Amino acid sequence: MAFRSQNFLTLGGRVSWAFYVLLLILVVAAGLRLNGVNWDQGFAFHPDERDIYMRSGCMYDLLADAPNALQCGYVLGEPDAEPGLPGVGTLLDKDRSPLNPHWFPLGSILIYILVFFRSIMELFTDMNALDMRYVGRPLSALADLGSVAMVFVLGRKFYGQGVGLLAAAFTALSVIHIQNSHFFRPETFSVFFTLVSFWAMWRMVERKRLRDSAILGLALGLAIAPKVSLLPILAPMFLVYWYRILDDVEGHWSEITSELVQRMFYHAVLAGAIAAGVFFITSPYVILDVGSFLGDIGAQTRMASNAGMWPFTIQYIDTPSFIYQIQQSSVWGLGIPLGVVVWVSIPLTAVLAVLKSDNRRADIFVLAWVVPGFIFLETFEVHFLRYVFPLMPVMIIMGSRMLLWAVRVDRLLSVHLIWGRIDSAMFISRIAIGMVIFVVVATAFYALAFQQVYAKDHPAVTASEWINDNVPKGIDIVSDNHWDEFVPNLYPYNVWQFPVYEPDTIEKMETLAGKLASSEYLVFYSSRPYASAARDPERFPFSIQYYKRLFDGSLGYELDRSFTNYPELFGVSFRDDAISRAGLEQPTPLNPADKSAINFNLGYADDNVVGYDHPTVLLFKNTGLLDESVLAVQ
């Protein structure tokens, strides 16, 4: 087997250079992830994260028997909930227990963690539910920092120390990792413990002890505790137990006995039982309130399987399977150079697994995670970018291996050019080394540019401040943010929300025409309404016409200004463009913002990429003052 047991000590007992390189990588990774913890200024623009904070706040109030705890959020719908610390009988009663979150799309452990930390912090200071972002987001960053370290461990174990260090550096600099670290959601925790479970799988193969299957079960349980997603990990788990069987018979298939298979089966059952136990301990009400658990999981499965079932998934109607996720992860999640490398590395790894035997087991293992996992995800119609996030660390290991393999491949080749034979070690190695340097520098540039998102105020906050400073109080404003986030602090204004996702009817559009005629401004929090309506013309024929007329100026509204916060560094910005994808005309703003010296328009960005921390907020002004009859549906 091509597994290595290098550590950070030299033969002389001194700490090796690799330790200092890894330490530097981790320091850089920590800085990129902890910068801008308060990126939303407390307005909680991520709906899932907000839900976790609010539910943990209500649970804390219920446990503390705080005033009005029974009127808090979800508790209002649970009339039997009993405040205070529960006894055993109350704890086991799903209706009375204050520890039942009554919400299972995500793991209960996330809520319990926040309640635990708040119970400690309340000893020293008063906090509200949204203040827990100062706890949740650093914890998410810490989990992803652990993923950087585990990528090094796995990369070194599979392909050597160089691959481990390069993969750790790429993971530290990957925007998809940096961005997810700024949200208190399950992904960073699940990814970290999934990588730990991969390490435990190899430990089990190498040491061949029952206790190693138990360690594997512990890691698996922690991997699924934040979010139930077990199926893709079964392929690599089956594979490593097959490796165990082959090792016990030294590769002689004919010597495999039923007793050996049965023994390995018991090892696997132990791992599965411990994983289930850990999951149930961290989320006990998935059993005690199994009906709600199955209902929530079923709803999430139906949502992912049917684009357009819920308003926030309409944007995925008719998005091409495989191509969409490859494009979005390459352009926005990793940056184009690294994105190309990691996706190209998949077929190359398959080829090397066939042609070369020295790393074959590692090659088959990483492919067993990435290929079935990606195919499984593409059975869904909804393609949130976060769905492929768990695949990224292993793909980065594969991509790093490919780059360093290219550096060494010159030993097997010679090059002939028209001016004569040259030494391959000088030609191919220099090209390959240059390619490695380019990908590292480009990935680092994009990572630093993305820090701009957290260095400045959120676009919705900037828009709110401008409106409050420049628009007279009490005027009418149309807000096109149905099933979307919001521009905060518009209480001094008469704000009417256009219900775009309600069925298109003449009455709906007549109401809109009346509001447009009487309002002075129209504001979008993000591109979601017009970008998603364009994906379903059969459901929203009138709304699509409204957006076309709005953006081409025929409704008498002109784009006053846009509020953006694109990734930018040294005068180079990376811009997304949802307007073109929606088939709308690009409006010319009355007050254009300053542009960077170099602007890369990278096209449409998935809502997961831009919708939470740097949406494009548009503010239209009613300059035409057209009559309601002119604004009506035509």
Go through each PLM region and give its residues.
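Signature aromatic-anchored transmembrane alpha helix within multi-pass, membrane-resident enzymes
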Residues: 1, 23-26, 238-242, 272-273, ...
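Short helix- or helix-capping micro-motifs
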Residues: 29, 167-172, 199, 220, ...
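Transmembrane-lumen/periplasm boundary regions of multi-pass, lipid-linked membrane glycan transferases
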Residues: 35, 52-65, 71-88, 106-114, ...
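Transmembrane-helix motifs of polytopic, lipid-linked glycan transferases
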Residues: 130, 134-158, 196, 200, ...
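Hydrophobic/aromatic-rich transmembrane helices and adjacent perimembrane loops
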Residues: 180-181, 187-190, 223-228, 232-235, ...
